[in-house]
Amino acid sequence: MIKINHLEIRFQGEQNSPYPGNGNLSNNAFLRIRAILERLGFSQRGIHGPVVHASSQIGGRDLRPAHGRGLELWLHPAGRGSGLPHPWRPALRLRAHRQPDRAPPARASEQPLRQGRRALRRRPDQRRHRPRMTAAALRLGAARIGPGLLAGLLMAVLAKLLSQSLHAPAPLLAVVLGMMLGALGLQGQLGAGLDVFAKPGLRLGVAMMGAQISWSEFAALGGPAVLASGAVVLGGLGIGALAGAALGLPLAEALIAAAACSICGASAALAASQAAPSSPENQRTTALVIVGVNLLSTVAMLAYPPIANALGLTAHQAGVFFGLSIHDVAQVAGAGASVSPEVAGTAALAKLSRILWLGPAVVLIGLMLTRTAQGGRISGLQAPPLFVWGFAALAAARGLNLIPPALVSALGACSGFLLLAGVGAISAKLGPKALLEVKPRLAILLVTLTVAVAILAYALTRIFF
């Protein structure tokens, strides 16, 4: 006879309960749980409704939240064994940990040493039972993340449509839509689905950006463009770290802002935020940086063409200057198109050369943050995140002409869509109150980085072109 040493039952609170997730059940659900407990041989004493809890008769421990998604109930037999005469599967998800009615096995240090793989295998009575993925569990998961996924999709679609009609930056509109959704106070119902876009969705979108890098097009600009863009990226990260320290900002926030200003605006900010530690403050900084770089890029789109004319730059030099200095791709194209189509093409290629450095920059940011967390030491080189490997793999595949042109366009559209949904999800989770609190030091850092990158881009344009 095998006795149940303890029993764990996970169940979900009713959605229409006044206190969802805190254990309030309908009478029908309570009767089902009590029937399960009686079937397993537990005493009826200590089982009360409509809230089920464990009293001193069956273990003395109350229900507790399981990460906000359900409850865990730990029960112990009241002085007698609770053997199962035959296999029986209840309607609710149930997991029992069983141990034989004998002394526990000796510790590993007391057991004789054995060679081979068999010594590492557990005996059947030591294996932990794992619940199977059932159709009910799949439906429950879909119901939990479905509303948030739908909200993220709608925000991305609306941001894209409004961007085309209003001629406004799509990431900025996604932030505004996310703030409007967050003002409704639906973070609890939509949080699980929004997390899908705010974490894995963002990383997948950044990885897909690698397919937009065309090595054959870079050959038209030559090696100096790659070197100049690398100098802009490294210089921007260094200036951002130093200026952020002078302003008293955390290194993670300073590097998120520096990546946005020195690489490719909102996309780089999102990629850098995935390399930084996950925290509400870093998410808030990311959203504020996206708003700031879009505003500064719009100002640069209007101001840089007359500045380039006043500085006496040729058409080719002006295109390179726009591509190396303006943050977002859309504003780079707008600034170049205001001069001539040839300048717009040159500016777009120079901008793509900065995106080429996104993967190495994310790895560098991760190393800088790891070194800071370990007190200036790096115990060992850590592997880059998976989305950086995906970015590099797609860039290499595009360079080897392994990706058809139609698939390149599809990957670009999916990447932009996932990034917009991620921006909206982050803004919706934070809410308008957190985003409307202006951080003066962060604003000063963004302006400083914009001016520094422009000066550096102008100097490199004069040197290499």
Swiss-Prot record:
GO cellular component: plasma membrane
Region described as Disordered: spans on this chain: 97-132
TM helices/strands, residue ranges: 135-157, 172-194, 219-241, 251-273, 286-308, 318-340, 352-374, 378-400, 405-427, 442-464
Pfam families: Cons_hypoth698
InterPro entries per UniProt: UPF0324_pro
Membrane topology annotation: Multi-pass membrane protein
Keyword entries, A-Z: Cell membrane, Membrane, Transmembrane, Transmembrane helix
Superkingdom field: Bacteria
Compositional bias per record (Basic residues), positions renumbered to this chain: 115-132
Entry's family note: Belongs to the UPF0324 family.
This protein's name: UPF0324 membrane protein CC_0425
Record organism: Caulobacter vibrioides (strain ATCC 19089 / CIP 103742 / CB 15)
